[in-house]
Curated annotation (Swiss-Prot):
Name of the protein in question: Serine--tRNA ligase
Localization (cell): Cytoplasm
Binding site for L-serine: T235, S236, E237, E289, S388
Family matches, as Pfam families: Seryl_tRNA_N, tRNA-synt_2b
Family to which this protein belongs: Belongs to the class-II aminoacyl-tRNA synthetase family. Type-1 seryl-tRNA synthetase subfamily.
GO molecular function annotation: ATP binding; serine-tRNA ligase activity
BP term (GO), one: selenocysteine biosynthetic process
Gene (name only): serS
EC number, as in UniProt: 6.1.1.11
Key word Manganese present: no
Amino acid sequence: MLDIQLLRKDLDGVAKRLADRGYTLDVAAFSALEAERRAIQTHTEELQARRNSLSKQIGAMKGKGEDTSAVMAEVGGIGDDMKASEAKLGEIQARLSDLMLGMPNVAHESVPVGKDEADNVEARRWGTPRQFDFEVKDHVDVGTPLGLDFETGAKLAGARFTMLRGPIARLHRALAQFMIDTHTQQHGYTETYTPYIVNPEILYGTGQLPKFADDMFRVEKGGAENTVTQYLISTSEISLTNTVRESIVDASALPIKLTAHSPCFRSEAGSYGRDTRGMIRQHQFDKVEMVQVVAPETSYAALDEMVGHAEAILQKLGLPYRVITLCTGDMGFSAAKTFDLEVWLPAQNTYREISSCSNTEAFQARRMQARFRNAQGKPELVHTLNGSGLAVGRTLVAVLENYQNADGSVTVPEVLRPYMGGMERIDAPAQAS
């Protein structure tokens, strides 16, 4: 959530910055609500001052033995007026809060201004795409003989679900273990196991609600009269970041660096017809997430560090990639700045997103009321960052395509072999004669 004081000080400036993000701020509606809020607040304060004055007058009159009934009646009337004004003020503030909850973060000044992904800026590349001396297959054709089973996944749960069997399932698990081990043993993160179902207020904290309710899977428990609504997480960023919700941490505890391997659940509303083949866009997929909670002055150094941590995974796997700076119009709702990592997929002859690393500055912290004690001992909002390290399913796709062989086998990347019992290659099972 944006700081409402920022809008009060420079409403037109904030509106311009939000317009760069493709969001139209209703300046007239905000101004009208603010004017009404100020008027009611001023009236309430005047009533409070009048009641305080009359209360002192009543005390003085009682000391003199004078009749206070008329003054007390006026005090009673003021009390009724104050209750009505406070109720109205609460209503106005709730409407302002609803308006604020729907506003995206403002972009950092270093973010390129643009409308969509066509205006993103490539920062750098690593690795050289492999030159194949045979016809390249996509991950579906490579993986299906090795245990990638879309038919059973669809039978069990419908479209955009996948079943993994045998060595492919083991390779998928190996990738996640390798990522977690790298982040905990080399990058300083604490491994965390989180709930996969969370309460609605948790999603408000990280910005998925109210705007992206249609993208979430909702679950309900209890009978018809006692239904409790919860949500399946779309990323473990949600639960990891909210661990500091409604708390004040000591500055000495920062940075807090957490990582988790979890399934992620997304309805993919609005993506009908996109990436319908294979594992690129799924309703359920695994991801290793990185989250950092830091002091404001260190958050952009932390963002660069986090991008480096995601890059390290790709480099160790030997997968070519590029780093993209997202423009204002392509960033996620909560982000102030985002870098995407895109891995090379030879069958598509292009780079595809495999990680997104973002600094949300104080946007999520303000929604969560997550603070730390600064050098002056005063509570101050932390900055929160999140990044994929990496999306496990898409990494599996990249390994299958980049490490495929002419005979249909897949070479296991060296760093994964300890997790695969020393296996160097995945071969299709022999066909019964």
